[in-house]
Amino acid sequence: MAVQQNKKSRSARDMRRSHDALESNALSVEKSTGEVHLRHHVSPDGFYRGRKVVDKGSDE
């Protein structure tokens, strides 16, 4: 097993963890329907940037 040679200080430990915070997802509101979706993704009702790009009934 790996064993540290010297104790890490609280400062060094916390500086290492400074990038571990969770970030929230980037959400967008669809222009035409007002529905919320992930950025650069088609909204659940098939719209993207104000245009209908996917028919809800199709299996594609």
Swiss-Prot record:
Positions of the UniProt region annotated as Disordered: 1-60
Keywords, comma-separated and alphabetical: Ribonucleoprotein, Ribosomal protein
GO molecular function: structural constituent of ribosome
InterPro entries found in the cross-reference section: Ribosomal_bL32, Ribosomal_bL32_bact, Ribosomal_zn-bd
Pfam families the record matches: Ribosomal_L32p (PF01783)
Residue ranges, compositional bias (Basic and acidic residues): 11-22
N-terminal signal peptide: none
Top-rank taxon, per record: Bacteria
BP terms from Gene Ontology: translation
GO annotations of cellular component type: cytosolic large ribosomal subunit
Keyword Cytoplasm part of the UniProt annotation: no
Keyword Ribonucleoprotein set for record: yes
The family this protein is said to belong to: Belongs to the bacterial ribosomal protein bL32 family.
Protein name according to UniProt: Large ribosomal subunit protein bL32
Organism encoding this protein: Pseudomonas aeruginosa (strain ATCC 15692 / DSM 22644 / CIP 104116 / JCM 14847 / LMG 12228 / 1C / PRS 101 / PAO1)
